[in-house]
Amino acid sequence: MAQSSSPISGVAERYAGSLFELALQANSVAKVESDLNSFEAMLAGSSDLTRLINSPVFSGEEQAKAIAAIADKAGITGLTGNFLRVVARNRRLFAVPGMIKAFRQIAAEHRGETAAEVTSAHELTAAQQTELKAALKSVAGKDVAISVTVDPSLLGGLVVKIGSRQIDTSLKTKLNSLKLALKEVG
């Protein structure tokens, strides 16, 4: 994911801000957020779609046609579908993951929540997510909207990012720390 000082992040934030303003005017923030979550899930599940959004080989028109077909088939219509088409025509599809993340953060702030990115070694159950939200609420001081991704390389535990803070309780990090400590001793 892009760092906040990168040009991708700036592009993503501007597009996400514009989409949020339009969604707010149309009273469809929840629908747009749901559509973006669906598109993100499709991205995570399809290497071909990932290749399409990242490849400079395809023209903006080709990307727009492909995205239109994919969005229509997935039921992503209206504001979100139009947004994805415009992003494709403007050759900014490479920034869509950042746009989705930025939109989530803006929407969470609008609801009085703070957004947290949670990376887990295994899929979290609904009960675990509820418990995690409660724990993060006590740390953040307000409701927390979490976005969970699974990374089996963590082996166990969680990595939680809230704003500029990161809480890393992953087994991978603990093992790496132990490895470094053993190198210093030996």
Curated annotation (Swiss-Prot):
**What Gene Ontology terms describe what this protein does at the molecular function level?**
proton-transporting ATP synthase activity, rotational mechanism
- Sorted alphabetically, which PANTHER family does this protein's record hold? ATP SYNTHASE DELTA CHAIN
Q: Which UniProt keywords apply?
A: ATP synthesis, Cell inner membrane, Cell membrane, CF(1), Hydrogen ion transport, Ion transport, Membrane, Transport
Q: What is the membrane topology noted in the UniProt record heading this document?
A: Peripheral membrane protein
**Name by which UniProt lists this protein:** ATP synthase subunit delta
**GO CC field:** plasma membrane; proton-transporting ATP synthase complex
Q: From the UniProt record, report the name of the gene that encodes this protein.
A: atpH
The record's listing under NCBIfam families reads:
ATP_synt_delta, PRK05758.2-2, PRK05758.3-2
Subcellular location, in the record's words? Cell inner membrane
Q: What superkingdom heads the lineage?
A: Bacteria
Name the family the entry cites. Answer: Belongs to the ATPase delta chain family.
The free-text function statement in the UniProt record for this protein reads: F(1)F(0) ATP synthase produces ATP from ADP in the presence of a proton or sodium gradient. F-type ATPases consist of two structural domains, F(1) containing the extramembraneous catalytic core and F(0) containing the membrane proton channel, linked together by a central stalk and a peripheral stalk. During catalysis, ATP synthesis in the catalytic domain of F(1) is coupled via a rotary mechanism of the central stalk subunits to proton translocation.
InterPro entries reported in the protein's UniProt record: ATP_synth_OSCP/delta_N_sf, ATPase_OSCP/d_CS, ATPase_OSCP/dsu
Query: What's a Pfam family this protein contains?
Result: OSCP
PROSITE patterns found in the cross-reference section: ATPASE_DELTA
